[in-house]
Amino acid sequence: MASTLPLSGVVITRNEADRIGRCLASLAPVCTELRVLDSGSDDETVAIARAAGAVVEHQDWLGFAAQKTLATSRARQPWVLLLDADEWLDVQSQERIAGLFASGHIESRDVWCLPRRTWFLGKPLRFGGWAHEYVHRLSRPDLRYLPVLVHEGPDLTGKRVGHCEARIEHETARSLDEYRAKLAGYARLWAQQRREAGRRAGRMSAAVHAAAYWLKHYVIRGGFLDGRTGWQFHACHARYVYDKYDLLRRTPSA
């Protein structure tokens, strides 16, 4: 690639020493600036990021949405590509982003939605619930994330949104146990968020929603076609769906 673009590559981190290098290396060919907002890593994350040429700043954890909003706002280029540390771009995606800028079409939208392919335990998921996922990651620095505890998304009010086929690769789990623990944490945050909004769950809600998830994603959308990997992934998520509604039902209001 001849030159970098008017683009800041932005990542939020905490203890991502085994992944941040790959992420930043994939951003470097297209980004004029690399920025990392770290929330207190006690491994080699910060050192690796600085060695990769990133500007590293510290911010105590504010929550997913606020942390991403702050990290994005500190970018010094007119465009931002926000990745998680467990994500990266391949060469083809770098070229597609470069082409979007070279054509001038980048200016026709405020936010660009990119496809994301999830890898689970070393294998790509080609079927099921996450096989055709899109995420809003290429934007102006003024993009804000909605203030929710989990599964944060950008505020697209008044934004012109486009689609670019520069795919983000996403390695979602280091191990099965780690992934289960992460989903358990998400379930607690989801239940807290819904409870604070005045929502409740009935006695059968957990079982019904988990069964519906399994039927829709593992059966109808073909998650079973990914073999053992597909079974493990969708079993984790069916359990996650069960847990979040069960927590919502069992935990009393404050």
Segments predicted by a language model, with ranges:
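Conserved donor nucleotide-binding strand/loop of the catalytic core
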Residues: 32, 46-74
